[in-house]
Amino acid sequence: MKKVTAMLFSMAVGLNAVSMAAKAKASEEQETDVLLIGGGIMSATLGTYLRELEPEWSMTMVERLEGVAQESSNGWNNAGTGHSALMELNYTPQNADGSISIEKAVAINEAFQISRQFWAHQVERGVLRTPRSFINTVPHMSFVWGEDNVNFLRARYAALQQSSLFRGMRYSEDHAQIKEWAPLVMEGRDPQQKVAATRTEIGTDVNYGEITRQLIASLQKKSNFSLQLSSEVRALKRNDDNTWTVTVADLKNGTAQNIRAKFVFIGAGGAALKLLQESGIPEAKDYAGFPVGGQFLVSENPDVVNHHLAKVYGKASVGAPPMSVPHIDTRVLDGKRVVLFGPFATFSTKFLKNGSLWDLMSSTTTSNVMPMMHVGLDNFDLVKYLVSQVMLSEEDRFEALKEYYPQAKKEDWRLWQAGQRVQIIKRDAEKGGVLRLGTEVVSDQQGTIAALLGASPGASTAAPIMLDLLEKVFGDRVSSPQWQAMLKAIVPSYGRKLNGDVAATERELQYTSEVLGLKYDKPQAADSTPKPQLKPKPVQKEVADIAL
């Protein structure tokens, strides 16, 4: 019965797309150099790059909702962290010999520096306005308890001191000092409990929805940019000249139009996979998606909000994905401070918060069903974790909160459903299929269409991700003297690493902090810490990571 239902659904979708395409032929075809599918931060960032690099190119953006930045980019649908690995312990895994690996943390931090430079440049151009409306200084802290976790944090702190990107980080195991940094976390805690924390003053809270809205508003000021809302892509067809004909339905009046584009970017968040499959490019056959949602507890009580100014990340418990770390965060949303705690994983077959329950089924094909099955069979611990999260009661979530806020009161908190994150499943020659954390740009060989898949670190690295896309699909132009000069004006550190260069790191942090109105003091000498006593890591199968 399920197979019959799925087949009928696929036939209905296919017939609808054919019908739409036929109707669209009757209307005049619109032509554009660049078609941006999705009104989120990725499309907005790519459009902003291209507006500066090729101001004469025409651009069209289509968004199925009635406004831009209403899905994952919306400030309430994500954690709003400027991910720079200052506090996220999953970016510094423990090696088999007990040592700490910092390669991933360095890469994440380097990427966020590119985002800071990109945003600062847009502020200087007048594209982004009033930096405090979208980015604010909020210290980033790691907080752990228990002998093994304290040893881990000691070792992590020591390892990160090898990088110029993490200078200025503080470390303490003193209850009084940590209480000064994060009083809400320490008040009511057992004074004998062994705890440790790191703190970096230059952490940030970012409203990616506000950045998206401002970038798109600036693009709209140009006559060769068009924004079409309530417009859903129903079909993509490659033409003989390697352009694309994209059929777009107007969800308000039921009409359809064809847009002929030289380059198509699919930046549709969770919906990107299905649209990539619709394009028919062979590269799409390697991918499948698995949706995971997230919930947060939210407090707007001034007694709570005014008592906490930090993002405090913990360590994932045994058997949980490393990325699932609980955190209690100061957020600044629409000019108002709130505190969020979570995330708690949820499950829905929707690929978007405003998506369809058919999303998962309709994206499952003969080419990706086996990789999906392999991932499910190979990651039973992950399946078990997701089931346990879905089964959490209100009391369970409140008890989790009290581990980070011992004096929390139920009446101060409400539950909020954030966005959907579609995890990448990729075909693998050895394992059949693997779950991939991170984002991935998928494009055809001709560089005429590209999609962004994945969820983490996502919005905080939109600027470097779109730089990667430019290099992948516009390689010849990127290597030209003209584009090179402009890219280095947009991102001063473009083409080189900041890590290891103390002077360059401080120069870029000082520059971006000044333009973006962020706090930046010259780093002090590192804190002295007890020598970590890390043991070799036990041999055990690791839980696959996911983004929440």
Swiss-Prot record:
Residues 539-548 have a biased composition (Basic and acidic residues). It comes from the Bacteria. InterPro entries: FAD/NAD-bd_sf, MQO. Pfam families: Mqo (PF06039). It is an enzyme of class 1 (oxidoreductase). The keyword Oxidoreductase applies. Gene3D superfamilies: D-Amino Acid Oxidase, subunit A, domain 2 (3.30.9.10), FAD/NAD(P)-binding domain (3.50.50.60). GO terms for molecular function: 2-hydroxyglutarate dehydrogenase activity; L-malate dehydrogenase (quinone) activity. Its cofactor is FAD. Residues 522-548 are annotated as: Disordered. Keywords: FAD, Flavoprotein, Oxidoreductase, Tricarboxylic acid cycle. Its EC number is 1.1.5.4. Belongs to the MQO family. This is Probable malate:quinone oxidoreductase.
